[in-house]
Amino acid sequence: MDIPLDAAEIRPEPPNSLDLNGSSTRKIKLTAPNINLSLDHSEGSILSDDNLDTPDELDINVDDLDTPDEADSFDYTGQDDQPALGEAVQEDFESIQEYTAEEERADNRLWRTVVIGEQEQRIDMKVIEPYKKVISHGGYYGEGVNAIIVFAACFLPDSSRPDYNYVMENLFLYVISTLELMVAEDYMVVYLNGATPRRKMPGLGWMKKCYQMIDRRLRKNLKSFIIVHPSWFIRTILALTRPFISSKFSSKIKYVSTLAELSELIPMEYVHIPETIVKLDEELRESESPKAGCLPNEPEMNTLEEEFENKMGDND
C-alpha cells in the first residue's frame, strides 16, 4: 500500500537567486602561477634567460612584411591642397623683407616728439614732408637776434585731399614747434599771401587754433605781422578773428601790397620768396593795381575793399 506524501514535502525549495539565463553558472577557480619579482637572474625571475627569446624565435622574414605599396592607404582629402598651401606660406615668408638698422633709424625719423603747451605731441613728418617749405627763417632785423619768420601760404596743402584735416593737424604742430625753435628774442612774421588759391587758404578754425596754441612768450615777443599781397579773403578772415584776438595783436598787423614795399621794412637778403609770388608781384605792378592785391583767379574788388576799410575805420 502506497503511502501518500504531502504536497508540501515534494515541493522544491524556492531559489535564493533568479536565474535569468535559464542555466546555472559554474564558478571556475584559477590559480595564478608563481612569479619571482626579484631583479636577479635566478630561475623564475623576470630577468631570467629562460624568458628571453632565442635568436631563432627573433628571426623575422622581411619578405612577409607589407611594404607601403602593398599596404592599404587612406585617401586624405587635403592631400592635393598641401603643395599649394606650402607654396602660399613660402610666398608669405618671401614677401617679408629684412628690416635693416638704417631703415629702422629712418622710420624713427618719420615721427617727431614735441612739447607744446606742456603736452607731448607726435608729428607725422612723412605726411607733411611736401609742405615743410611753408615756414622758413628769413634772417634777422635790427640789433641782436630778432628773427624774421616767413610763412608762405602757397605751400599749404590742397583742401581737396582726403586726409586734409590730418595733414593740417600735423602741419600745425610742425609750424608751432618750429617757431619756438627759431625764435630766441623778438621776432616778426612775414605772411606771403599771394599766389595762393582759395582751396589752399587755411580756414578760420585753423588760424584761431594756431593763435591760441602759441606760447605767451611768443605772443609777447611778436613785434610785427606783415601780410604781403593781401586779398579780400584774408582781410575778411582777419576781421572775423578780431573777437578772439587781443587788440595788441591787431595793432601789429600790417598790409604790404608789393615786394618793394616789403623791402623798405625789412632786409630781404635771406628772405626766400617763391617764384610764383615774384611773378605775381610783377603782374600786379604792370597792371598798376598794387592796392587790390587780388589773386589772378580772383575778380577785382577795389570797391568792396574800400567799403571794408571805411567800416573798419568807423569801428576804430
Swiss-Prot record:
Subcellular location: Cytoplasm
Family annotation (CDD domains): SEC14 (cd00170)
Chain ranges of the CRAL-TRIO domain: 128-285
The keyword Signal belongs to this UniProt entry's keyword annotation: no
Key word Isomerase present: no
TM stretches of this protein: none
GO cellular component: cytoplasm
Keywords of this entry: Apoptosis, Cytoplasm
One of the GO BP terms on file: apoptotic process
SMART domains reported in the protein's UniProt record: SEC14 (SM00516)
Region (Disordered): 1-24, 287-316
Main location: cytoplasm
Protein name, per record: Protein prune homolog 2
Taxonomy of the source species: Eukaryota, Metazoa, Chordata, Craniata, Vertebrata
Gene: Prune2
